[in-house]
């Protein structure tokens, strides 16, 4: 079936000559400013390297790595590749690293997840069919493996050596050696493996089956299921948690909002609805709220609203007060933060100042097209070597006693 103009990306390509002459773009970031709502507008002049100028590998700095196509397989949201943006230089586009990951017909496959192993200096990209490991210094693909049952959104252990890799909505997860890609173990869960978070402690992995109202917990020493959290009000979609692995916040089917669970007792604690905005149909994911993140200081929960193209901000503590709402340019399906909590990244392309709620920039590629993706991660480099990395999930990052 032919894709609609909206699916392919409705933004018109901005003429490069206009930018070279110094024209600027105004970003529509208007947000209502009454009660629990705040205003947010911004403008920017994109700054990108000449399209034909080669960019060297390696580098030193703090970068945002964005894997595309990161919204289904829509190439209108940034094309195909691993796009690099300089966070400390106004999120300027740096380069596009060629990637693999193709359907059998040769067209780019949907990117399903992205993660980093700092010790192996590698970034990993999962697609519908397989997984590729890319060396951050050489920017070459080290290996690409097609996994039986396909792949979904994975998560790597804190020591960088083990990956929990869900099959593509099948009944199992693979436990994978990140250096070789070899399968260490297989964990049968339910029917539709989907999202994964390897706990910050390294002792537990949390697995969401998108047709189950339970969040499954595995012991990472035995690779066996040891606990179920919930059950929640409907099947679990994206989720996030506090750094001490005490509280989990989850999106669930049909809810514009989120639910809260206790990771220690296994109980569901609360159901929180977005107030003042209508629920209804969405373009993607079949769910009004697909995307949730905890600010690194663990004070706020940011929740995507695909119905109204908004980001809603809540207090992370009961009674979970609704604080404000930010208007976005397209449907958000994901949100994450920089490690320091300065910036929030919506999958609709906005770079948001987390404290002021202002939209500062739109991510744009070498052709000045807006880049949208649900698969992005912050990486710190020193001479081409990773020294620290964020996460595709917006996780709590408060220090834990004993760490």
Predicted regions and their residues:
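Short, flexible coil/linker elements and helix-boundary hinge sites characteristic
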Residues: 9, 35, 106-108
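Signal peptide processing junction and immediate N-terminal pro/mature segment
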Residues: 36-44
């Amino acid at each position: 079936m032919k894709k609609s103009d909206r699916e392919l990306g409705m933004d018109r390509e901005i003429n490069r000559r206009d930018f070279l002459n110094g024209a600027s773009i105004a970003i529509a970031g208007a947000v209502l400013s009454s009660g629990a709502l705040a205003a947010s507008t911004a403008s920017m002049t994109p700054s990108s390297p000449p399209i034909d100028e080669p960019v060297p590998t390696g580098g030193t700095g703090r970068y945002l790595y964005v894997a595309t196509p990161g919204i289904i397989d829509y190439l209108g949201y940034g094309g195909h590749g691993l796009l690099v943006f300089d966070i400390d230089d106004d999120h300027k586009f740096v380069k596009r690293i060629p990637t693999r990951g193709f359907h059998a017909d040769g067209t780019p496959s949907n990117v399903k997840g992205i993660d980093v192993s700092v010790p192996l200096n590698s970034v990993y990209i999962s697609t519908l069919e397989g997984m590729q490991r890319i060396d951050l210094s050489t920017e070459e693909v080290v290996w690409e493996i097609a996994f039986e049952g396909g792949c979904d959104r994975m998560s790597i252990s804190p020591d960088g050596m083990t990956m929990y890799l869900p099959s593509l909505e099948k009944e199992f997860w693979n436990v994978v050696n990140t250096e070789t890609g070899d399968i260490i173990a297989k964990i049968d869960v339910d029917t539709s493996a989907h999202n994964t978070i390897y706990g910050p402690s390294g002792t537990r992995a949390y697995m969401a089956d998108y047709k189950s109202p339970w969040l499954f917990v595995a012991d990472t020493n035995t690779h066996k299921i040891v606990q179920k959290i919930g059950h929640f009000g409907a099947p679990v979609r994206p989720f996030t948690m506090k750094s001490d692995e005490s509280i989990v916040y989850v999106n669930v089917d049909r809810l514009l909002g989120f639910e809260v669970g206790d990771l220690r007792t296994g109980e569901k604690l609360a159901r929180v609805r977005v107030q003042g905005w209508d629920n209804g149909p969405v373009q993607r994911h079949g769910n009004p709220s697909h995307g949730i993140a905890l600010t690194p200081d663990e004070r706020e929960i940011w929740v995507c609203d695909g119905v109204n193209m908004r980001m809603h901000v809540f207090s992370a503590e009961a009674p979970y007060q609704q604080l404000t709402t930010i208007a976005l340019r397209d449907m958000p399906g994901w949100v994450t933060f920089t490690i320091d909590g300065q910036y929030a990244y919506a999958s609709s392309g906005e770079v948001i100042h987390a404290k002021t709620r202002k939209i500062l920039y739109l991510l744009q590629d070498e052709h000045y097209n807006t880049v949208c993706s649900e698969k992005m991660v912050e990486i710190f480099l020193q001479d081409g070597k990773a020294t620290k990395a964020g996460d595709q999930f917006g996780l709590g990052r408060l220090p834990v006693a004993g760490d």
